[in-house]
């Protein structure tokens, strides 16, 4: 096992643990266990999944939930462009698999490696590690939800916010992400009393996407 593979598997397990919260909260939001697991297996991007169930659980429409999840998942397209040069797919099936596994963690582990072979190993170890553990722990959380009882009685009604913050926190190491996060939070709070459930988080996603697009030229210059 190479250093990149060890790093990828460690990241996979640590990230996968959040799946327990997702599974339990998905069921509490109105999904059944199979739907929760399917969402993890098919959508497979934590931020988008928590946004989806947050909107659904708050009474928002499926369209608003899907819109919020989609906007939060746009960043994976940018990752894909970067990884296409670092870890180019060798076949059509591999390209499809890499598209599914292109997330924050697999990209971070791949980019952190200096050796080209290690970049590929790191990507696959992190991508597959997160996928397996995320889906497995999502299933565990969905099944365990029936045994947990009322979420508010255990103080778990804020678990979605805490889990989402946990996913976001590692990305707030620079000034720009912090400013964007604060601005998105302000927009969300301002919209809560004024618009139907589900739309505030969609508004925050629009703000984040617009800010990312506005900073795109500078980002491209810094990575070239």
Model-predicted regions and their roles:
Residues 6-99, 117:
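Pore-lining transmembrane helices
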Residues 44-48, 71-78, 162-168, 188-190, ...:
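Alpha-helical transmembrane segments and their membrane-interface exit regions
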Residues 28-29, 86-90, 147-152, 194, ...:
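Membrane-interface elements of multi-pass transporters and channels
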Residues 66-157:
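Helix-loop-helix junctions within the multi-pass membrane cores of secondary transporters/permeases
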Residues 1-4, 117-118, 216-224:
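Intrinsically disordered, low-complexity non-transmembrane regions of multi-pass membrane transporters
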Residues 118-203, 210:
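Membrane-embedded alpha-helical modules
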Residues 2-18, 31-37, 42-45, 152-173, ...:
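Helical membrane-embedded segments and adjacent short helical loop/helix-boundary regions
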């Amino acid at each position: 096992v190479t250093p990149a593979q060890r790093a990828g598997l460690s990241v996979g397990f640590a990230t996968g643990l959040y799946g327990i919260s997702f599974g339990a909260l998905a069921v509490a939001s109105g999904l059944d266990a199979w739907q929760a697991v399917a969402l993890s297996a098919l959508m497979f991007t934590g931020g988008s999944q928590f946004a989806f169930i947050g909107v659904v659980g708050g009474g928002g429409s499926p369209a608003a939930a899907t819109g919020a999840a989609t906007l939060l998942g746009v960043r994976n397209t940018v990752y894909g462009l970067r990884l296409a040069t670092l870890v180019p797919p060798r076949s059509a099936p591999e390209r499809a698999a890499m598209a599914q596994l292109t997330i924050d963690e697999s990209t971070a582990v791949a980019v952190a490696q200096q050796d080209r072979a290690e970049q590929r190993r790191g990507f696959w170890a992190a991508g597959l590690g997160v996928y397996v553990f995320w889906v497995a722990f999502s299933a565990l959380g969905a099944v365990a939800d029936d045994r947990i009882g009322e979420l508010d009685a255990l103080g778990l009604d804020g678990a979605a916010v805490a889990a989402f913050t946990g996913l976001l926190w590692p990305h707030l190491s620079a000034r720009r992400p912090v400013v964007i996060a604060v601005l998105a939070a302000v927009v969300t709070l301002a919209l809560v009393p004024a618009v139907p459930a589900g739309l505030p988080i969609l508004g925050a996603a629009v703000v984040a996407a617009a800010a990312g697009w506005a900073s795109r030229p500078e980002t491209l210059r810094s990575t070239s």
